């Protein structure tokens, strides 16, 4: 019972993080969610079902609430609807904890549930195409961003915890490129290299105030422009007012313009290469959790991963088109996004996998997908990557789940060497 309540609370965080708070009516999802928790804890399963159904009326596409609905049906002895929902979730790679969830204990001997368990076991089998490329012995680096210079073959890792950037040369030698907190560098969320212009871009953001983030800098963010050859700071762009910034991703086009995703203000900024000005490019107020950003090879379209899917933005007009997709293909929970040969490479951390989504000719829909890597025992919150020719390099174990909200390490003794994998595309 206690574990289930904790599970529901975790799901609540996911639910409301993916929703515009202004759209949640006080008499609908919020209240019904709290009532569903109370009903569950009091074993009033008929009410638990009733309230969960009402939440789903507001958020019909929320998979976590769909899972809750399956559990509510099971606790009310509705086997048919339980199995139907769980099968749909498992087909998408979700609901893989159902076999051990006590809410479904009464179904253990039912043939349909036994078949579902076998399907879950198949879904949990690893898909492996990656090889280890580099090992970084600095266990407490907590890398979030990775960048690549095709001219020197150097990789660059940015550190959330140590507020620095390290360089890995082609022989695997590792050294600090931008030392800890140099130039006022804070937690480094993402990096990008413009090899032709010899520039390394870095995003640094401060989140909510806590023991490590004083209120006077909370919600501020900075864009750093470094000389890629010697690490000297060329310029620092400040985003101070209004507060609430949190920069997550960046991508550049062929003429040097930089696009930056600000999930805090739900905005995409553009740093104009000719004018050297930072300006708001497009408002993303209807799209929470901007977690991935990439650009088409012809510089005509941006692709943005957000809490509920992936968007195509036509740069010339600002037209936003949510990517359509077959029902069995899941586009949510993409942390980092990369355009490659009319496809998108995505790290779906929540699903513990690296995937490649094939795009339609007009780039407005996903037609198919391929799992490049999944359920790897070395994974511990895989982080961002880079594409070098036919290979995708990525951080296999950022270990960000070992940091609390204030940025403190929870269990230092459990940290491992950082692994950089490469998967053939």
Language model region names:
Residues 168-173, 227-232, 272-276, 314-319, ...:
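Short loop/turn segments that connect beta-strands within beta-propeller blades
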């Amino acid at each position: 019972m206690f574990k289930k309540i904790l599970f529901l609370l975790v799901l609540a965080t996911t639910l409301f993080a993916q929703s515009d708070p202004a759209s949640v009516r006080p008499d609908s999802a919020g209240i019904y969610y709290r009532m569903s928790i109370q009903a569950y804890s009091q074993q009033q399963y008929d009410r638990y079902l009733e309230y969960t159904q009402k939440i789903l009326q507001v958020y019909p596409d929320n998979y976590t609430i769909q899972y809750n609905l399956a559990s509510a049906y099971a606790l009310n002895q509705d086997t048919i609807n339980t199995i139907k929902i769980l099968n749909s979730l498992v087909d998408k790679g979700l609901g893989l904890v159902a076999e051990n969830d006590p809410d479904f204990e009464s179904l253990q001997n039912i043939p349909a549930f036994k078949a579902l368990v076998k399907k879950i076991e198949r879904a949990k089998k690893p898909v492996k195409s990656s090889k280890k490329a580099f090992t970084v012995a600095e266990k407490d680096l907590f890398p979030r961003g990775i960048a690549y210079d095709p001219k020197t073959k150097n990789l660059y890792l940015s550190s959330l915890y140590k507020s620095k950037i390290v360089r890995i040369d082609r022989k695997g030698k590792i050294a600090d490129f931008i030392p800890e907190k140099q130039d006022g560098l804070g937690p480094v969320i993402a990096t990008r290299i413009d090899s032709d212009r010899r520039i390394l871009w870095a995003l640094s953001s401060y989140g909510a105030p806590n023991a490590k983030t004083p209120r006077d800098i909370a919600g501020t963010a900075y864009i750093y422009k470094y000389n890629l050859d010697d690490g000297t700071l060329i310029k620092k762009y400040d985003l101070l007012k209004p507060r609430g910034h949190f920069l997550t991703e960046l991508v550049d086009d062929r003429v040097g313009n930089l696009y930056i995703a600000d999930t805090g203000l739900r905005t995409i900024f553009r740093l104009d290469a000719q004018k050297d000005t930072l300006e708001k490019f497009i408002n993303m107020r209807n799209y929470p959790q901007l977690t991935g950003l990439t650009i088409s090879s012809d510089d005509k379209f941006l692709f943005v991963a957000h809490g509920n899917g992936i968007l195509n933005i036509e740069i010339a007009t600002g037209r936003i088109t949510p990517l359509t997709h077959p029902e069995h293909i899941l586009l949510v929970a993409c942390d980092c996004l990369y355009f490659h040969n009319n496809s998108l490479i995505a790290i779906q951390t929540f699903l513990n996998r690296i995937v490649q989504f094939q795009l339609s000719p007009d780039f407005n829909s996903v037609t198919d997908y391929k799992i490049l890597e999944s359920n790897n025992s070395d994974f511990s919150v895989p982080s961002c990557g880079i594409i070098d020719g036919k290979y995708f390099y990525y951080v296999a174990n950022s270990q960000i789940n070992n940091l609390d909200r204030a940025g403190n390490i929870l269990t230092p003794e459990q940290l491992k060497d950082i692994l950089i994998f490469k998967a053939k595309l």
